Amino acid sequence: MPAFVEERTTDARGVALLDNEPFPDTMKLRRRNISEAQFGQLEQHAAAIFSALGMDLDTTTTMKTPERFIRALFDATSGYEGDPKLITVFDTECHGGSHCRSSQVIEGPIPFFSLCEHHALPFYGCAYVGYIAHEHIIGVSKLTRLVRLFARRFSVQERIGQEVADTLEVMLEPHGIAVYLQAHHLCTQMRGVAEVSPLTRTTFWRGAYDSDASLRAEFLTACGLQSDRTHSV
């Protein structure tokens, strides 16, 4: 049974901002196409910033850098164009039985890239997502799309995991949800404390995972993770 399907709108006018769409049409909500005049203004702002920082924009390799930079930003934040409500949900064989449950569904590692909303610098890593289905499931590939939909925005690591867990809870109403993320943050590697190889880990537990330590251990073991090195949120 298809669920969470909304009418999609697109705008074909203006500048095509993405060469390769990262999300299929079934997850598209809108396109952030803008006019050529608006794009030109963004280029001018980017050029002003680069010039102030000392970049020579008159060389053959840098004269198109402002344009490439703006396009790269739209590509890196394409998650704003997607909508998790457009993911198709299927029924399981559990019909009204509160104790009917499936085995754990675990997907990972799921590589992701995001932009920190504090400094607009990248952070990147991988995610593991698991849930114990009740009456609804989604295709395992959709877990990957869900992570990347929320990651390809200006965000923070904690929010990405929270949004994935919240969305699965609303869509599937499963017995439990587990989300683990680990990432390198360039805002700590390139600036500030300038630590070369810190790895930030966050975990999110819902339902049965939150109340059952053995389920958490089973999830972490299946993912090849150390249970004593994660920070729960």
Model-derived segments and their meaning:
Residues M1-V233:
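A domain-level signal for the structural core that forms small-molecule/cofactor-binding pockets
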